[in-house]
């Protein structure tokens, strides 16, 4: 059985790591490069960096941060936010990222998924999905709707349909974020995670809501996710990556304990 990945997520704004609840009330919690180094040394399998306001503010890429991270850590990392073109993808990969995450830009221009996969390989293209629970209706039969621009804009797109479409277009992985659960630390949206995981064949990363090790266990077992994104539970020192992995290992979830 493939090992399950534990992936710290660093939301970056103006070159600093921030954290909020449901994409709001963000506070500064540190330097992203230094935090990445700490998590790398603690045993993270990968790290994700999101420039959380680049798409909304139509700003450029955080290339300087990417370069510094690439010089500091030696595990895969992905970068999202502000990536609108294949040229942006190339520049970010050349700066040292292993993967590119597209979210708002892919919803507005789905061809960026197929173009990126063709040029760089599907393994480099991650679809970020920000999802809200809504009333089921004709356009949203799953009851989960895609939102973009940091949760500001509802798109009238069904999350399950979009996950399948992104896979068809060539995405190699999905990072599935529940905005309803984001930063609340009460657990991932297991229903959403399982729905997407069972209906695509590419890896799914559960995101939004981790507060205790049991939450990761539930996402990786009941939710059938391939990986789990964590933020608040390690950013604020409530848990360690080593402690989380030990908890999972003791309960039969395959994780990489040591390099």
From Swiss-Prot:
GO annotation, biological process: L-histidine biosynthetic process
InterPro entries xref list: Aldolase_TIM, His_biosynth, HisF, IGPS_HisA/HisF, RibuloseP-bd_barrel
Catalytic residues of the enzyme: 11, 130
Annotated EC: 4.3.2.10
Cystine crosslinks: none
Pathway: Amino-acid biosynthesis; L-histidine biosynthesis; L-histidine from 5-phospho-alpha-D-ribose 1-diphosphate: step 5/9
Record's subcellular location: Cytoplasm
Enzyme class: lyase
GO MF: imidazoleglycerol-phosphate synthase activity; lyase activity
Reactions that this protein is recorded to catalyse: 5-[(5-phospho-1-deoxy-D-ribulos-1-ylimino)methylamino]-1-(5-phospho-beta-D-ribosyl)imidazole-4-carboxamide + L-glutamine = D-erythro-1-(imidazol-4-yl)glycerol 3-phosphate + 5-amino-1-(5-phospho-beta-D-ribosyl)imidazole-4-carboxamide + L-glutamate + H(+)
Pfam families: His_biosynth (PF00977)
A single cellular component GO annotation: cytoplasm
Keywords linked to the UniProt accession: Amino-acid biosynthesis, Cytoplasm, Histidine biosynthesis, Lyase
Function: IGPS catalyzes the conversion of PRFAR and glutamine to IGP, AICAR and glutamate. The HisF subunit catalyzes the cyclization activity that produces IGP and AICAR from PRFAR using the ammonia provided by the HisH subunit.
Subunit structure: Heterodimer of HisH and HisF.
Similarity remark: Belongs to the HisA/HisF family.
Protein name: Imidazole glycerol phosphate synthase subunit HisF
Gene symbol of the encoding locus: hisF
């Amino acid at each position: 059985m493939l090992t399950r990945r534990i992936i710290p997520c660093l939301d970056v704004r103006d070159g600093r790591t921030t954290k909020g609840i449901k994409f709001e009330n963000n506070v500064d919690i540190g330097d992203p490069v230094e935090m990445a180094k700490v998590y790398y040394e603690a045993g993270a399998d990968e790290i994700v960096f999101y420039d959380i306001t680049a798409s909304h503010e139509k700003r450029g890429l955080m290339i300087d941060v990417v370069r510094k991270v690439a010089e500091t850590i030696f595990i895969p990392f992905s970068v999202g936010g502000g990536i609108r073109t294949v040229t942006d993808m190339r520049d970010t990969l050349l700066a040292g990222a292993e993967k590119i995450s597209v979210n708002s830009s892919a919803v507005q221009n789905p061809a960026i998924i197929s173009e990126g996969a063709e040029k760089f390989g599907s393994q480099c293209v991650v679809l970020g999905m920000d999802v809200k629970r809504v009333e089921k209706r004709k356009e949203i039969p799953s009851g989960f709707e895609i939102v973009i621009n940091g949760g500001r804009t509802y798109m009238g797109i069904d999350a399950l349909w979009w996950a399948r479409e992104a896979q068809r277009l060539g995405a190699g992985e999905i990072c599935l974020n529940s905005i309803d659960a984001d930063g609340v630390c009460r657990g991932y949206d297991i229903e959403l995670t399982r729905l997407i995981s069972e209906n695509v064949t590419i890896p799914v990363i559960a995101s939004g809501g981790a507060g205790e090790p049991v939450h990761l266990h539930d996402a990786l077992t009941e939710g059938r996710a391939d990986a789990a994104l964590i933020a608040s539970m390690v950013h604020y020192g409530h848990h360690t990556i080593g402690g989380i992995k030990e908890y999972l290992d003791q309960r039969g979830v395959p994780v990489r304990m040591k390099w």
